[in-house]
A protein has these predicted regions:
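Cytosolic regulatory regions of ion transport systems
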Residues: 1-160
Length: 160
């Protein structure tokens, strides 16, 4: 039922990026190929978090903190920031931006999403040191609530 709805919705909004909750994980590939969506299974996500709690308790605790929005200055969050043209980080190597963000804002750069040849954003997790940061890249960061506001002002960037 969801697949039919999503396929029909896709006809009206062909360029929309969709995340669809699914109950039947055997339909994951079907959703990806037929409807061009990112299927999200609550059971798969829950199982991975549960396994972390069993075998890597500290990792699971940290993950839980990252999955919830930062409420206080010492809470941590994962955010993405769109880097506008003319920002000082544009044209710099990933490793240099990583070090600068850590030293200046106590933020950890964990990935970059940039426009690929097909015009869609492509996520690079922990890219090579020499990868150049460009305008309109999304910087994927782990940072505290206290660092977030300062970083927004300094980057002249928007979240999301």
């Amino acid at each position: 039922e969801k697949l039919i709805y999503v396929v029909n919705w896709r006809k009206v909004f062909p360029n929309a990026r969709l995340i669809v909750p699914i109950d039947n994980t055997s339909l994951t590939k079907t959703f990806i190929t037929a409807a061009e969506v990112l299927p999200l299974s609550r059971d798969e996500v829950s199982a991975k978090i549960f396994a972390s709690y069993l075998f890597e308790f500290d990792v699971a605790t940290y993950l839980f903190d990252l999955l919830t929005p930062a409420q206080a200055d010492d809470d941590y969050d994962i955010q993405q920031h769109l880097l506008p043209a003319g920002n000082g980080f544009c044209g710099m190597a990933y490793s240099d931006v990583f070090v600068a963000l850590k030293k200046q804002y106590n933020a950890i750069l964990i990935g970059v999403s940039s426009i690929g040849p097909d015009g869609e954003y492509q996520l690079s997790k922990n890219p090579a040191d020499n990868r150049l940061i460009e305008s309109n890249d999304y910087l994927i960061l782990i940072l505290s609530g206290g660092s977030s506001n300062r970083l927004n002002e300094a980057l002249q960037a928007s979240i999301g």
